[in-house]
Amino acid sequence: LQVMLFQPFRDFEGLPNPMRAKAFDRAERKFDVMQELGCDLILMCSSCHPAALGGIDRAAEDFAGLGERAAARGIRVGYEALAWGRHVNDHRDAWEIVRRADHPNVGLVLDSFHTLARRIDPDSIRRIPGDKIFFVQLADAPAIDMDLLYWSRHFRNMPGEGDLPVTAFMQAVMATGYDGPISLEIFNDQFRGGSPETIARDGHRSIVALMDDVRHSEPDTGPGLPQLPRPVTVRDTAFIEFAAQGQEVSKLETLLDTLGFRRAGRHKSKSVQLWRQGDVRVILNAETEGHAGSAWNARGTTVCDIGLNVGSALDTVTRATALGAKPFTQPLGPGELPIPAIRGLGGSVMHFIDDG
């Protein structure tokens, strides 16, 4: 386990004395902690201090001086433009400050939210040398018109789960030649109370899926990433399967009949029925063993399986498992055919069916 980034250090640049001197002293104390942790990179976010003075040259001078102190300690300084910064709220201004500071230990930290929430064209990142980008943080968010700080602190989500053009952001980043860490910075009220393992797996999935999308436009991206099939088109729902036992089976049969469904068949050797209304298929599974039996024991009458018609069942499962889904199999009975499947959310199963 490695601490790759120490954050945040707030309200550093643009302060008049004696606050300026105190800011440098604070930085030295943070450097002490970083050296104990074995961390060599600190994130300095653009100042929100009411006493901070504007000016690119003033900020660049502060960072040039800090770069000297950091270099003496074997530390690098990454400057990030907060979307709500007092004077600097745009990565283009942050880059100009870093450029004018002209110090090898001073670089840029890019956060997709801070750029995209202000609707800044991510292609402007392409003009930044990749070796001056020290760290990249990713977050998506739903398109909500609200205060930037509140939006950031409560509504961020995983890349690909919101409305921000995170793929375009990463395409621009990778076009610079950046080869450093890619991290997630997600502030979200639901995540704070969620399962850390589940959230971590979802985060890993989101990064792999995002970088796979980026790789198709930037072929040199991510040599260590798994080779994924392209996303497969879902044509429609093949079936919905319910696990039920005892009187609940009869109740479901009555309900389906009332809704206009008709029993279209029974399994030759299992307590399984197929009900149809046009192209809509519902399966009633009253088996006491296998997945349906386990689902009923855990939750009672429930949807235990969903079948989807897709362009390629094999490609769908291959992509899903590469993104962290767990493949599903169970023993086959006489005359039964294997159908590609994965475990879904909440203990359910998803089967994938194609023309093959």
Regions found by a protein language model. Give the residues of each.
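Vicinal oxygen chelate
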Residues: 158, 216-221, 226-230, 235-246, 276-286, 293-356
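Active-site acidic/histidine proton-transfer and metal-coordination neighborhood
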Residues: 5-107, 117, 198, 210-214, ...
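Short, acidic/polar
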Residues: 19-33, 118-127, 166-169, 248, ...
